[in-house]
Amino acid sequence: MMEFDGRGAPRWKVRPPAARLCPLLTLGPHPQFTGKDLLNGQTDGSSFPNGGLRATHCAGAFLTIDPESPPFILGDTMYLPSVVAAYTGVALDEKTPLHRAVQALSKEGVKLLGQLGLKTAGLVNNIGLEQEIFLVPRDAYFRRPDLQFAGRTVMGRLPGRGQEMSDHYMAPLTEHTPALSCMQEIQERCFKVGIPLKTRHREVAPNQYEFAPLFGSVVSQTDQNLVVMQIIEETAAKYGLAALMQEKPFQGVNGSGKHNNWSISTAEGAQLLNPAQLFAKTNNPDVFPVVMAALVSALDKHGDLLRMAISSPGNDFRLGAMEAPPAVISTYLGADMTSYLERFVAGATETYTPRTVPLSFGVDAIRPIEIPAEDRNRTSPFPYGGARFEFRAVGSSQNVSLVNTVLATITADGFKTISDRVEKGEKATAVARELLKKHFRVVFNGNGYDKSWPAEADARGIWRINSGVEAIQRFTVDKNKALFGAFKVFTEEECEARQEVLLNHYIGTVECEALTMVDMINQHVIPSIKEADLKEHLPAVAAACKKVHDAVHALHSAGDTPKAAAAARVLRLETMIEARKVVDAVEAVVPANKWTLATYKELLFLDSTDSQWGM
């Protein structure tokens, strides 16, 4: 089916079926389906979120196939991963900027490594994405308008048991509920479209689960993760379940993330974040500390951009909530690596070899094993893990294109900072030592949940942005527009458009949640109170409902988009939370047979409560 011309470009030719099989082909000048139709296309760009880049009177958007992300067939449909640009050439998708950033990373990395004596054809950016989800009974889901319309519960009293017993994480998937069969089919369907889901297991919260794939190219892995999310939702419905991707669908139990395990290597296979393998490939002890200096400095300089990239609406409830990393952008390197880099800054030229230590179980029949000398720090947003960094703060519902666009861009900037000075006559190791000394404040090996850490982070001068709305607005500050422009990742116009899209998404999400809350109070809570003859609670509930309703209307008169987004955040994190307290207190006293909404007990205990599966 596929041929290539002399320049290596794909040349597809699809043979039309015989006329007897397709009579339309015999009806005069009807166009025939050709290979060109698979390579290129066009659509209406004004109907997608575009931040003003397109309008109804100038709506052209053009697509072309992305050769770095393999096509696949799902059901009766062939999917061709593509990139999308406007008639004017600006990117309308999230993938084109990702390609641009990875290209910049490779270009700057090749240049710096060449200065260190390591010739390479290019750099490869790999990721592995851990996708967390909730699976809840579908019959209960349909009795929760908030889950249907907003993806999270805007009210709901905690049951007598949550995750206090710590008995869900890694527990066996039992066969008497559909969760196991559902997850097996999800994995099988993913295998059939070339997505290698490696693991499946329970997570910490009740009804919370996780899938994780083998590592792969950042572009194809990003595409494939979106397909995984689609397959999860479709398959869950088949088994009488509903899949929840939102970061915080339930109050009082852990929310969901999507850990973005991130690494870079040369085209020839030298892993730049694996010190032992890198030295074996290069025989140069300077490469690893120089790469680490570039990354540490990039993280310190551009932590605001990393915080911006994870500002999904649901992450407002997770970051800093003792279940996900805090909103402070720092990195954990571990005592061993930290000590090595401190010696490097002091002038040492030793090769870094990660230490291992023996672990004895104290049982004669079980042999001791060798383990890494470093522990794991789950409170760090960007910990080093031996051959990769793990960006732990990404939200479960997110398309990770922007996250990885930012990571690639700031790393390219770190590489360029060093290589530009080397071109002027400085030594790469000397520049790396200076950068590490200046930016080492971003390294924090302690407990990110410690109440003293935010104040210490402020004293260090590293990035801490608690508000997702404020973080989104870092997209268009001068330093960041200049950074993206320098590496041709985003134009100023593209930065401004994406900020507008992100803010409008936040506003729209909150408005949907708030209006759903108002409807649920009026259509379910108040009738339940009346049915239970608990009318003394009506004034407080009605007043709370009115506050939420009035706050929604105030959004529309807030002025510009940033002001509306700031007002939406107050509505969500203050007004709606106060209303929820009132409603949840009422749920506690209304008899179960009078309460029409599905309760947390019905939603959260798929494996341990009576249900349609006969438990």
Residue ranges, per PLM feature:
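Glycine-rich, acidic/polar active-site loops that bind/position phosphate-bearing ligands
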Residues: M1-M245, F250, N254-K258, S263-L502
